[in-house]
Design a protein with these regions (language model features):
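Amphipathic, Lys/Arg-enriched alpha-helical "gate/interface" segment within cytosolic domains
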Residues: 1-144
C-alpha cells in the first residue's frame, strides 16, 4: 500500500509515497470514505511530498475521477481538501483538478503541511477565505 491514512479530530491526513497508480489512489479514497468517521470530518489533507503519479495517469483520468467524486458531495458537504505537493507533475495535476470546478470539496494546494493546516484552521465553514499571499509565502493560491 503506497499510502497511510491517519484519522485526526475533525479530519483525515493521507500520506502517499512512491509511484501512485490510479487504482491505488482510488483504493485510498474508497478506504477513507468507507470508514464510519468519514461522515463527520471537516478536512482532508493529501500529502504527496514523497509521491509521484504513475506515468500512465492522464488529465482525462483526473476529469473522470472528479466527476465521480462529485457524486459524494452530500456525504460530507463541509469538507475542505488541502493538497500538499512540490513535485512539478503533482502540482500540475492538483491545479488541473482544482480548475475543473467539479470537485465536491473546496480544494487548494500547498507546498507544506503546515501551510495546509493553517489554511484549514482559518476557514471555519463554507465560504472559504483566500489567504493573502506575499512574495515570501510558500503557499499556492487556493482555488475555490
Amino acid at each position: 500500500m503506497p499510502y497511510r491514512i491517519r484519522w485526526e479530530g475533525h479530519g483525515v491526513y493521507r500520506r502517499f509515497f512512491g509511484v501512485i497508480t490510479l487504482a491505488e489512489f482510488r483504493e485510498a479514497n474508497k478506504e477513507m470514505r468507507s470508514d464510519v468517521r468519514y461522515e463527520g470530518i471537516r478536512y482532508i489533507i493529501s500529502d504527496y511530498l514523497e509521491a509521484q503519479p504513475a506515468p500512465e495517469i492522464t488529465e482525462q483520468d483526473l476529469r473522470t475521477y472528479a466527476r465521480h467524486e462529485r457524486l459524494h458531495f452530500y456525504d460530507s458537504p463541509d469538507i475542505v481538501q488541502a493538497i500538499v505537493a512540490t513535485d512539478l507533475k503533482n502540482v500540475q495535476y492538483a491545479r488541473y483538478y482544482e480548475s475543473l470546478g467539479v470537485s465536491p470539496y473546496c480544494t487548494a494546494d500547498f507546498a507544506t503541511v503546515a501551510d495546509a493546516r493553517w489554511w484549514i484552521a482559518n476557514n471555519p465553514r463554507r465560504g472559504w477565505n483566500r489567504p493573502s499571499l506575499d512574495a515570501t509565502s510558500t503557499m499556492a493560491v487556493p482555488h475555490v
